[in-house]
Amino acid sequence: MDIRLDEGFLFGMGAFETIAVEKGKPILLEKHIERLEKAADFLQLGSCSARGFSKEKVFSYLASQDSEMTDHGVLKIVCSAENLFFQMRTNTYSEEDYAKGFVADISKVRRNETSSLVYHKTLNYGDCILEKRAAMAAGINEKVFVNTKGQISEGTVSNIFFVRKNMIYTPQLSCGLLPGILREYVMSKFSVVETIIYPDELMYYEECFVTNSLMGVMPVRQLGNICFPHRTRAEEVRTIYESEKMSL
């Protein structure tokens, strides 16, 4: 792989997508491509498609990979001013993770809702990586950011949802979060209220779950010192997504 040392490498001025691949199919590929192009435009990288990037290139790349990798894998697409490349790895989320449910904590790092970078999936990803590592070192699954106003925004690698009286709630975009592909899917299938949620309000919710393109829908059994013993709504959302994802 020939990678040029452009501003993507030097300053994080690049965009990327991570896409679940199941049985050789990249899930929600068109949505990911659309978001990648938006980020490339925001960062003034130039159009990805103008450089020859296409769905056909993605499928050609996947066809060249080992079938064990593409049966339950992760496709990463990275775009910077002078680079556009694919990378493949296995998807490590397991049924055991879903059965147990995630344990998360509130991060001490604040999400900057005033930064435009927060709303795009860019190579400026240091806060997320460091806090995800901190979560793993602490023996938990995820850290959840609050913004400079103390409002819950998102996880290090996930969007977050809460359930109260069977209604689904999620932080509104202005709280400083990536508009996730699975977040968009959930909001297209269910009635979801976008709102402002503070950590001291978590006791009023009965369920919590997080989403991203690789895990899909993951129940959360504990966030900080708040436990969520119920997962009825989360399981409903996950069941519908799992039944539809191969057609998305």
List each language-model region with its residue ranges.
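Short secondary-structure junctions
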Residues: 64-73
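A conserved short beta-strand within the histidine kinase catalytic ATPase domain
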Residues: 75-77
